[in-house]
């Protein structure tokens, strides 16, 4: 069994156990995103995960199957750095497993900054 298949099986099992994983964004996720100035983006298939430390483009980026690009912000202070680390793990799991994600992303910058991310059950 390939590494990608093992990761996909693990992510699917975790999604089945999770009460927050649904087809489409969960109501909890939608409600939280709607309380912000960010936009809800549902059912995104992430295909690339990029880590960049260049001065002008510093950060983590994800790319969708349709070419959309989003940035996962860095955080310097605890507990924010723990939360962004979890968002990066979810994004990486989605890329490796092929599972879709729902994102709450701020359109205030380009590329849009992900404020929240949720795995979508298949």
UniProtKB/Swiss-Prot annotation:
Disulfide bond residue pairs: 33-104
Function as written in the Swiss-Prot or TrEMBL entry: The biological activity of the toxin is produced by the A chain, which activates intracellular adenyl cyclase.
Domain of life: Bacteria
Quaternary organization: Heterohexamer of one A chain and of five B chains.
Alphabetically ordered keywords of this record: Disulfide bond, Enterotoxin, Signal, Toxin, Virulence
Secretion signal, residue range per the UniProt entry: 1-23
Lineage: Bacteria, Pseudomonadati, Pseudomonadota, Gammaproteobacteria, Enterobacterales
Pfam family, one: LT-IIB
GO molecular function (one): toxin activity
Transmembrane segments: none
Cellular-component GO terms for this entry: extracellular region; host cell membrane
InterPro entries (UniProt xref): Enterotoxin, LT-IIB, LT-IIB_sf
Name of the protein described by the UniProt record: Heat-labile enterotoxin IIB, B chain
């Amino acid at each position: 069994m390939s590494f990608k298949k093992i990761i996909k099986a693990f992510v699917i099992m975790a999604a089945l156990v999770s009460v927050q994983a649904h087809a489409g964004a969960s109501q909890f996720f939608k409600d939280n995103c709607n309380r912000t100035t960010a936009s809800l983006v549902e059912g995104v298939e992430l295909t690339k995960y990029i880590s960049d430390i260049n001065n002008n483009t510093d950060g983590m980026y994800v790319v969708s199957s349709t070419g959309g690009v989003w940035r996962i912000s860095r955080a310097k202070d605890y507990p924010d750095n723990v939360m962004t680390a979890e968002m990066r793990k979810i994004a990486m799991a989605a890329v490796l497993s092929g599972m879709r994600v729902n994102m709450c992303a701020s359109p205030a910058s380009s590329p849009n900054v992900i404020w929240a991310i949720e795995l979508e059950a298949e």
